[in-house]
């Protein structure tokens, strides 16, 4: 399989809107018109149940992992640069899905899948950042933004200090590029956070969050 065909496969793989299809199939709802109007796992879990939310999360992560892994197996001559290109194609497919009129999701889970194959330690660090931010603020979107911002930093420090290896500027540059894209896809979330109208991941947390804000 040549480079263009595999890159196209990566884009199509990433563009499969699992969240939209699962919500439509099992709950009969258009996820793009409810809640945060996002097709990702958080909105699916919030609206139709976290059993489905976690399924969507796993599938969206797999959309990022599969093209990167398969490109290393079937197009090994492409090396890390081509694996990264396939990863970027998968993330762009998720963000601009042709199945949804070239609209899509935020790209966080798919990005996690891409770098879980290439830099698992950095991904674990980013997950830790996400969890800390989420536990404190109760916003998945804010945790995702901070995780995407810190991912390149965690990669650089973990590579140098833990693995004692040289930083790949291909990997680092791609991380920065995708992280910037993720921040752009969260621009509406950022506005809602500033306006204090952002939705919590779990409905029951809304009252607790409002009470906490009133005490500040």
UniProtKB/Swiss-Prot annotation:
Q: Which UniProt keywords apply?
A: Cell inner membrane, Cell membrane, Lipid biosynthesis, Lipid metabolism, Membrane, Phospholipid biosynthesis, Phospholipid metabolism, Transferase, Transmembrane, Transmembrane helix
**Where are its TM segments located?**
3-23, 48-68, 82-102, 112-132, 142-162, 166-186
Any keyword Lipid biosynthesis?
Answer: yes
Pathway(s) the chain acts in: Lipid metabolism; phospholipid metabolism
Q: How does this protein lie in the membrane?
A: Multi-pass membrane protein
- Cell compartments where the protein resides: Cell inner membrane
Q: Name the family.
A: Belongs to the PlsY family.
Q: How does it assemble?
A: Probably interacts with PlsX.
This one is known as: Glycerol-3-phosphate acyltransferase
Which species is listed as the source? Leptospira interrogans serogroup Icterohaemorrhagiae serovar Lai (strain 56601)
